[in-house]
Amino acid sequence: MNRRRFIETSAAAVAALSAASCSRTRTKWRFLTDDEAETLAALCDQIVPPDDFAGAGQAGAVEFIDRQLMRHYRKHRATYRRGLAETERRSAARFGRAFAGLSADLRLEIAHSLEREQPAFFNLVLNHSMQSFYGSPRHGGNRDAVSWRMLGVPDPPVRGRSTDYVKGDTVSPHAAPVASAPSKKVNAVVVGAGAGGGIVAKELAEAGLSVVLLERGQWNTPNDCRKDDLRNQRTSLLGAPFGPADEGNPRVFVWIDGHEQIALPSEGAYSNNAACVGGGTLSWGAQAWRYMEKDFRMRSTYGALEGSTLEDWPISYQDLEPFYEKAEWEIGVSGDDAANPFKAPRKRPLPMPPLSPNREYEVLQPAAKRLGLHPFDIPMARNSVAYNGRGPCMRCRWCVGFACEVDAKNGTQNTVIPRALATGNCELRTGCMTREILSDDRGRATGVSYYDADGRLQTQLADFVVVSCAAIESARLLLNSSTRLHPRGIGNRYDWVGRNLQGHTYTGAVGIFDFDMYDDVGPGAGLAICDFNHGNPGLKGGAMLANEFIRLPIHAVNGLPPGTPRWGIGHKQAMRAYYKRTAVVMGPTQEMPMADSRVQIDPRVRDRWGIPVARLSGDRHPHTLEIGRAMCEKATMWLKEAGAVRTWPMPPGRGVSGGQHQAGTCRMGDDPKSSVVNRHCQIHDVDNVFVVDGGVHVTNGGFNPALTIMAVGYYGSAEILKMWRGTGMRS
């Protein structure tokens, strides 16, 4: 008997015991029957078989799936019920026995037939078995963290812990009162408490204006953190913990073939950002990049591009530079870009030194230098030392997609919003969904209507309105604010609201090394090059390339070398062999904007409040894909020089853009016929409505956009205050 046959036969015997044990020890399932549970345990142990370590069935896959069929997987109940019955029918028809009692070879035969002929059911079991085995133990699978022990990664506590604040001069956000009732007329109502809106609220409140800050989500604290590999903003397989909830918050996603999908926030097509105080800055990876000077004048640098609305920004890098600096110091950024010869000029260094290198950094940095490239430390909105009253990063692997359990990751929720509230001039209302911007018979805004935390429709009057809901939701709000004078929505006289939806097409390469690259020192990403952001022959722009954040085990399931089996003993052995020896180099390809990549209002689908939802459609420009393919080659070159013995590309894909780096839908420009807001972030035809978020970006650079959104927040606030003091926006 050869080794493979021995393993499979031994696995069958162990799996049979697992299935029998499953049936004997669990008599009260939430959804499954005892017979279904026995069948499912045997099938899960085919997908992740037992060897020296338990298989998926032994490690609690049935408990995991049964629990989720009453929760997040409710819509899959019928598929499971039919599929498990079909599994038993095939087993009885072919072999005259129950599936759990078959030999390894016969069970594999049934499993392969299900994969071929019942793919919807089989793929569910495949995905859910992998999630249970490689995900967080708190959901019933991965019992005793068996997969993490198999891969050689630590098994930390599942729950977060309280934050011990370092004494400082900032206000703890968790002591701030949060109101929900309407108030008298105020100077400004700001819709959205994220990267842009939080800054605007703070700047206006500190200038003495009365401000109401409306946020649809909640104010999460470090004590709300959960180290959950399956339920976070990046890997939302069991939901997005910082909102919005799946129930009642759909969007319509149109594929390039015209097929329409109703997408939920936990699904990739949704382009979700966190809906909470702090917005995406609560759970971001915290890369805090300045755009380069050329990123603001792409049309002047490269000329027109057929099929693209490529244009220059109406403002320059020099206009934003002091506001970049202000964001870096008030939010808090660590890093050192002294070794980056391509950086835009700065007047002041970053306030904190970089984090110390991890293993990937130590391998990739000298390789980049050997290639004549210029590696340097990524700027991070993360404390490397105690700063602004909070302690330093503890270097865990749960970073991007997670809130920081020690509050060392900096966002508007723990920096500027507490300062806004401390003035006494700003009132924060959470759980409040804005329905529309209200306007008078002259077409000027008078305030907003919104649903409060109890679902009651309220009105908040204001001298002016600031929209900061992120690019997709900001466009949706403007389009839903239609009146007699604004029949197509506020700012949409020339049909530009919602167009030019951009994000970033992430591309790069994966490398396998013959030594460990993984050392469990977070956040993972730490080293970057900007050699290919511009100056690539025949290309308009490029991308920053960097090592990736730590890949959790669940991320590696579908990231193994091409040709690896999707399941079975071969997949499990590949996970064990390659997980710690894999490194990823990737970057955000600068996208070429297109008018047909857009946000519209769906005519049929509405959310839980009865508001028409966003409809996303379009495609990526062919030149964007060309840039992405070129970046794959550059990343591959870097990995090979670093010693990778095998590499493969992460090529760009077609389809609607957006994602967490969404931008462009309320484009800034001097011409009202081709833009939505002017250079002051002011709607062209409504002088007391402003948009201050990534929606105003004309182009989105080859970098993570959050620091630019923050800089625009400070810049836009300064422009608003100039107009407030000078011309009287008071109504």
Predicted feature locations:
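Conserved redox-cofactor binding core of oxidoreductases
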Residues: 237-238, 244-252, 263-268, 290-295, ...
